[in-house]
Amino acid sequence: MLKLTLALAALALAASCSQEPSAPKRNPRLPEPSALAATMQAMTADMEALKIKAQAGTLTLSDVESLRMAHESIKTDQPTKPEDIKESFPGFAEAYLANLDNLYEAIKNQGDVEAQIEAFNAVISTCESCHQQHCPGPLERIGGIKAAALVP
């Protein structure tokens, strides 16, 4: 009987270890993020991923085009709390997209790495400026996305 119990326990352990890990579960008490929050989460992840490319000077036109298309909805996405959005928000959204266009131009004009870093950081500075007025919570994380300037 003991051998049977041990065999079943070993089998159960082996079966549980071979299963694929489940996706992290959301806290059911937290509401789904608004469209604007989801876009900004994607923006953060995208810019964090491109920081290394910016520092290496290996950003491509395709990288920036993809960002521009993915983030265009920032102008129309609904916020979590519409009453917290100030009149200045649309201007910041437009400035963010314009700075992505400037980054695109810096790459297109085959600007040196320093010019690409400067244009990349201008995009991030737009995010910082907006968050100083609208939602200061992620400011530290946003500041950490800036690419380090080249040391002469």
Tell where the protein language model's regions lie, with residue ranges.
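C-terminal motif of bacterial Sec signal peptides marking the signal peptidase cleavage site
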Residues: 14-16
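Bacterial N-terminal signal peptides that target proteins for export
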Residues: 1-7
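Active-site-proximal loop/hinge segments that shape catalytic or ion-binding/gating pockets
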Residues: 10
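Sequence context surrounding c-type heme c attachment/ligation sites in exported
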Residues: 18-152
